[in-house]
Structure formats: structure tokens, C-alpha cells
């Protein structure tokens, strides 16, 4: 029960990221427009008082502000798409449901335009409809309902005379019906909920503000590993607290109030639940990265230095902390707990200093400049001394604890000598033992990248033993273990199944072959290899691929390809080395010895070959642009979690991989070069 609820909360948290991702663009427009209209910047740049520039600035402010004015409908659309696997039909259903619910509530409560003049009554003008103000929560509820309707009815069958309305066309019809029904209990219940939220936020924010901001920062940071922090901070940013703007409209939520106050150029009273991120993300975590680098073993410092520098810059500039936090979260939970405490104390410190800073994306330098320095409405410079103190604290604490407890942070891992001592033929036996033996295996499966095993007792699984046997990573989801052994995963699974059935009794009978992928590839005359797009679509960074095995580069480096037409082509001249039995992945080797894995979609192994048609055979020579696989893209979008297709270099070694700055691509477009 708990695991199911936890999984649903994770899905909701992930769905909230889509509408939240729009806010930085809106904030950028609003911040620049407001800054150009403000006296603080005009004092130093008098030429921006020019009428044309001021008109453009005014339009930018309006363009950014309209997004924040319509957050409820944006959240409704975004949550619907996020929970429905990206299908646009869910967004249409959400829009239909949103306007029907609001119109029905307004009519049921007999809300008139005159009543909108008193915002304390809880009414608002929503898309021109006088109705009950349900805010972002109302949008989230409608989005979740639209996604439920989509997932429930998208493939419904109807009698032939109603065939036009079958399938996805039925979803908006059901949404119209359910949202009409929902409006009545919402009209009755929501005022009580709103009064409760107001009472809670007033008591929390006005009576115990210091404790509230500390607990907010502390809990939000602790929830990041579970992906639930988006759910936690949403009420604080979009509902808790209220402020009346110049037009008499009640604005709710710390972030919305902050943006509205920046837009109107008034004294700031908001930002309590955002500003604590700046000292941590701009100063504290980069200092922690330095401590991790300096405590790495000498032979690993070059690699660790590159990783830590990249993660530290990402944290400093954008406020994205996960690449750095996940480098020590699992190996040193104590460090992460201390990090969470320091995060909460940062919120408390800036609150006590009476600062009012905010952001639209995260607490990085970019938001600090746009929404702190340029508006110049609060003593933003105090963040710098606080941040410098935090840098010292983070560096000293992290360095001391890493050395004291010998935490295996990046670059301090023990060498896995047992890898060399395990022959390929014995590997299936050893992996079975590491999984807890035959009796502990409930379900056994594999795809081209990983061994998927559902176990009876997770405590019997030797995770470190699996890594020592060559797994580049081990993921745990409940009692489901995923050990990343790369292309030989299916061979291991096949032999493990035969061992469990008694068909194999000794290592000499296994089929796993010796892995020679780590042997250096001799590139005698060819200095570099160009790799072209495997089809028509667009490119995303590997870090955005919705599968940790790929996004954390456990299989190797590369890119994510999002196909827009139903076909995969050869990215270079070479040979087909592997075609997985379910046809969802293909391995290639270039004429220069570069090995590439093209994994079509995420979790598509579960489709058992449906939607794929192989056009080549193993060991067949291919030329760049030659069709390799025909795919039913519509089927994949409907039945797979994602159609994002990782293109991975599996034998990069010490060679350098550079990426072309491209977005939309076709088979003739180069996407990366290895040399």
C-alpha cells in the first residue's frame, strides 16, 4: 500500500515539473522588463528611458506576468500531460474540464461581477468567468482528473454506430461530464478548505515564521532523493500567504506574491520560502565539491575534478543541485542529512537578516542577478558574506567527515579486484549467488542494458558483490533489482534461468562470452569518427533521458534522441553487431571500431517486439543513413513510458567525445564526434 502511494506521489511530483519549467522563461521576461522600467537601473543606464525601449520593457513585463496570472490553467494542462505520458489529448480534456468546472461553480454559487470587487469573499475572474477561486490546487485537481480519464478511456471501444467517438475522442467527453459533477462538491467543500489553508498559513507564517522557514528548507531538502519536494513546496509557493495588489486582487503563495511585488515595484514582503537556497547553491555546495575533489585518491583526481567542477558550476549558475548531491547521497547519508540541516539554517539566517529574495527556477546566480541585484529592492549583498561563511562550513565539515568515516565519495572507492578474478563462464553462477540464490528469485528478466530481478528478500542481495562482478550500477525499486551488466545482461539472464531449472550444472556449460569491450580500440589512421542522427527528430542531453541507467552514464556517454518519424537509420558506416530478440535495441560497430548502442524508447523490452520491424541482420554491413529498424511510433507512444532513444558509445575508453550544438535533426545531420 505504502509503495503504491509512494509511486503515485513520485508521478505527481514529476508531473508538476512541466508547468514549473515554464516559470523561468516567464520570470526572465518579467525581471528584465521590470528592471528596465525601474529607477535603479535607469540611474546607471539613462539611455533605456527611450520610449521605444520602455515600450518593449512594458511588453516584456506583460508577457511574463500573464503566465503568473494564469498559473491554475497552466498547472491543469501540465499535470494532465505529465500524468498521461505526454499525450496532448489529456491537455485538451484538462482545458475542457477547467472551464466547465469554473463556469458551473460560478453559476451554482451565483457569482456576479460585482462580487469580485471584494476579494475577501474568495471569488475571482478566471479566464473571464466569475467563479470560486481555487487557485493552483484547483488546476492540479483538474489535471489529475483529466489524466485519470485519459488513462481509463483512451482505448475504449464503442458500438459501430458510435465508432467516431471511440478511443481518445471519448476522453474529453468523459472529462466534460466528470468536471461538471466535480463542480458541485468543489463549490461546497472548497470554501472550507480555503479557510483552513488561510488559518494554517496565517498561524504558521505569522506566529512561528522562523521555525516555519527552517523546517521548510530542511524537509524540502530531505525529500529531494524521493522526488517528492515538488509536491511539498507547491502549497508554500502558490497558496500559503496572501497579499492584495494595486488592483485589489488577492495574490496567494510566496512565489506569486514575490513576482507580483517585483512587477509593481513595491516594498517586498515575500521570498521567505525561496531565498535560503542562494547561500547553499552558490557557495555551500561548490565548496563541498572542492572537499570531495581534494579527498579523492591521487590517481582519481583528474576524473573527479572534471565531474565536481561541472556539478559545482551547475549548482552555482542554475541552482540545479542533484548532480552534486547524488554523488554523496547514497555513499554518505550523514553528509546529506547535515546538508539538509544547513539548508534549513540558511533559510532561517536570511529571514533573520530581513531579506526578501526569490526566484522562478532555483537559487542560482542567474536568478540572483535577475530577481535580486537588478530590482535592488532588498539588501541582496548580505547573501555574499553569508555564502562565504557557508562555503567554509561546507568545506570543513565535508572534508573532516569524509576522512573521519572514510566515506566512499567519488574517487575514494575501493578497487574491485574481483572483477578480474571472475571468468565469464562462471559469471551467471556468481550473479545468482549475489542475488541471494535460486530461492530468493521471484521473477527473472533482462533487457539489452540490465538484468531485472524481482527478489523475495532484498536483504539477501549483495549489492557490492554485484558491482564487483562487473555491474556498473545497481538500482533498487522495492524488491526489484536492476543490475547493469550492459549487452551481456540477456546472456546472464538466459544462463541463470537454465541454472535454476537444472539444465546447467557447471560453468563450462554457460553461454556468456568473454567481454573484450574494455580492450583498447586501435585507430591507426582514422583520428576521429563522426556520428550522425539515427533518424528524424530532435536531440536532448543524456542527463534528461528518463532512465537512470542512461542519464547517469552507467552504459556510457552519448545523447538522447526523440524520434518524430517511424524509423531508425545507421549513424555511420559499419556492421550490425547485436539485435536484441525483442528488437527494441541494436548494437553497431563503426568501420573505425567505435561501438554504439541505440536503445529505442524506455522500457520497450516489455513490448516483446510489438511495434518494431528489423530491416537488417546481425553481422550485416551497413552504410550511414541506411534504414535499420522500422518502428510504429504511435504504438510506442501509447504503450511505452517514453520514446526517448539513448544513443550510447559503449567503448569510449580514453577517447574524447564532443557534441554538436543541434536540436532538430535528420539522418544527414552530425550529432557528435569521437576522437
Curated annotation (Swiss-Prot):
Membrane topology value: Multi-pass membrane protein
Domain PTS EIIA type-1 intervals: 547-651
Domain of life of the native organism: Bacteria
Catalytic site positions: 447, 599
Stored InterPro entries: Dup_hybrid_motif (IPR011055), Glu_permease_IIB (IPR036878), PTrfase_EIIB_Cys (IPR018113), PTS_EIIA_1_perm (IPR001127), PTS_EIIC (IPR003352), PTS_EIIC_1 (IPR013013), PTS_Glucose_EIICBA (IPR050429), PTS_IIB_1 (IPR001996)
Keyword terms, alphabetized: Cell membrane, Kinase, Membrane, Phosphotransferase system, Sugar transport, Transferase, Transmembrane, Transmembrane helix, Transport
PROSITE patterns: PTS_EIIA_TYPE_1, PTS_EIIA_TYPE_1_HIS, PTS_EIIB_TYPE_1, PTS_EIIB_TYPE_1_CYS, PTS_EIIC_TYPE_1
Residue intervals passing through the bilayer: 16-36, 59-79, 81-101, 126-146, 173-193, 199-219, 273-293, 303-323, 328-348, 355-375, 378-398
Domain notes: The EIIC domain forms the PTS system translocation channel and contains the specific substrate-binding site.
The protein's name in its UniProt record: PTS system glucose-specific EIICBA component
UniProt organism field: Staphylococcus haemolyticus (strain JCSC1435)
Chain's gene name: ptsG
Amino acid at each position: 500500500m505504502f509503495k503504491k502511494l509512494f509511486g503515485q506521489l513520485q508521478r505527481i511530483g514529476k508531473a508538476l515539473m512541466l508547468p514549473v519549467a515554464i516559470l523561468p522563461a516567464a520570470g526572465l521576461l518579467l525581471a528584465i522588463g521590470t528592471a528596465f522600467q525601474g529607477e535603479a537601473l535607469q540611474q546607471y543606464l539613462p539611455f533605456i528611458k527611450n520610449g521605444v525601449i520602455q515600450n518593449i520593457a512594458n511588453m516584456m513585463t506583460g508577457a511574463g506576468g500573464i503566465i503568473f496570472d494564469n498559473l491554475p490553467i497552466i498547472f491543469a494542462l501540465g499535470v494532465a500531460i505529465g500524468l498521461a505520458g505526454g499525450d496532448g489529448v489529456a491537455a485538451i480534456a484538462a482545458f475542457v474540464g477547467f472551464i466547465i468546472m469554473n463556469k458551473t461553480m460560478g453559476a451554482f454559487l451565483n457569482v456576479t461581477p460585482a462580487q469580485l470587487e471584494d476579494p475577501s469573499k474568495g471569488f475571482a475572474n478566471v479566464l473571464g468567468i466569475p467563479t470560486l477561486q481555487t487557485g493552483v490546487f484547483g488546476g492540479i485537481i483538474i489535471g489529475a482528473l483529466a489524466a485519470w480519464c485519459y488513462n481509463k478511456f483512451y482505448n475504449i471501444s464503442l458500438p459501430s454506430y458510435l465508432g467516431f467517438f471511440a478511443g481518445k475522442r471519448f476522453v474529453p467527453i468523459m472529462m466534460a461530464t466528470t468536471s461538471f459533477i466535480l463542480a458541485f462538491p468543489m463549490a461546497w467543500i472548497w470554501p472550507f478548505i480555503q479557510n483552513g489553508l488561510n488559518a494554517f498559513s496565517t498561524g504558521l507564517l505569522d506566529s512561528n515564521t522562523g521555525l516555519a522557514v527552517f523546517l521548510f528548507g530542511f524537509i524540502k531538502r530531505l525529500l529531494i532523493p524521493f522526488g517528492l519536494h515538488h509536491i511539498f513546496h507547491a502549497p508554500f509557493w502558490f497558496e500559503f500567504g496572501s497579499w492584495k495588489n494595486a488592483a485589489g486582487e488577492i495574490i496567494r503563495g510566496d512565489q506569486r506574491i514575490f513576482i507580483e511585488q517585483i512587477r509593481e515595484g513595491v516594498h517586498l514582503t515575500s521570498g521567505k520560502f525561496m531565498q535560503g537556497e542562494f547561500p547553499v547553491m552558490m557557495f555551500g555546495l561548490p565548496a563541498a565539491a572542492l572537499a570531495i575533489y581534494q579527498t579523492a585518491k591521487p590517481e582519481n583526481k583528474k576524473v573527479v575534478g572534471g565531474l565536481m567542477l561541472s556539478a559545482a558550476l551547475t549548482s552555482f549558475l542554475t541552482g540545479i543541485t542533484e548532480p552534486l548531491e547524488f554523488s554523496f547521497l547514497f555513499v554518505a547519508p550523514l553528509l546529506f542529512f547535515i546538508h539538509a540541516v544547513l539548508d534549513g539554517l540558511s533559510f532561517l539566517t536570511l529571514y533573520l537578516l530581513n531579506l526578501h529574495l526569490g526566484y522562478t527556477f532555483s537559487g542560482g546566480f542567474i536568478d540572483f542577478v535577475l530577481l535580486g541585484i537588478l530590482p535592488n529592492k532588498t539588501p541582496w549583498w548580505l547573501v555574499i558574506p553569508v555564502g562565504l561563511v557557508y562555503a567554509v562550513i561546507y568545506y570543513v565539515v565535508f572534508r573532516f567527515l569524509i576522512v573521519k568515516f572514510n566515506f566512499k565519495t567519488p574517487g575514494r572507492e575501493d578497487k574491485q579486484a574481483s572483477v578480474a578474478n571472475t571468468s565469464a563462464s562462471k559469471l551467471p553462477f556468481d550473479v545468482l549467488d549475489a542475488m541471494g540464490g535460486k530461492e530468493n528469485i521471484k521473477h527473472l528478466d533482462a533487457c539489452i542494458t540490465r538484468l531485472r530481478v524481482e527478489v523475495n528478500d532484498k536483504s539477501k542481495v549483495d549489492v557490492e558483490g554485484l558491482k564487483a562482478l562487473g555491474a556498473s550500477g545497481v538500482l533498487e525499486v522495492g524488491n526489484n533489482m536492476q543490475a547493469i551488466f550492459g549487452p551481456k545482461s540477456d546472456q546472464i539472464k538466459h544462463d541463470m534461468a537454465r541454472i535454476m531449472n537444472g539444465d546447467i550444472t557447471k560453468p563450462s556449460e554457460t553461454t556468456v562470452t568473454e567481454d573484450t569491450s574494455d580492450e583498447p580500440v586501435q585507430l591507426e589512421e582514422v583520428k576521429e569518427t563522426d556520428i550522425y542522427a539515427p533518424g528524424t527528430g530532435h536531440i536532448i542531453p543524456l542527463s534528461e533521458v528518463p532512465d537512470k541507467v542512461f542519464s547517469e552514464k552507467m552504459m556510457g556517454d552519448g545523447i538522447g534522441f526523440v524520434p518524430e518519424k517511424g524509423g531508425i537509420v545507421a549513424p555511420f558506416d559499419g556492421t550490425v553487431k547485436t539485435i536484441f530478440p525483442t528488437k527494441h535495441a541494436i548494437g553497431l560497430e563503426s568501420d573505425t571500431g567505435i561501438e554504439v548502442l541505440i536503445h529505442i524508447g524506455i522500457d520497450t523490452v516489455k513490448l516483446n517486439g510489438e511495434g518494431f520491424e528489423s530491416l537488417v541482420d546481425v553481422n550485416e554491413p551497413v552504410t550511414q543513413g541506411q534504414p535499420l529498424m522500422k518502428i510504429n511510433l504511435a504504438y510506442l507512444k501509447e504503450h511505452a513510458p517514453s520514446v526517448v532513444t539513448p544513443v550510447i558509445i559503449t567503448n569510449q575508453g580514453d577517447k574524447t567525445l564532443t557534441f554538436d550544438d543541434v536540436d532538430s535533426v535528420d539522418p544527414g545531420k552530425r550529432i557528435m564526434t569521437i576522437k
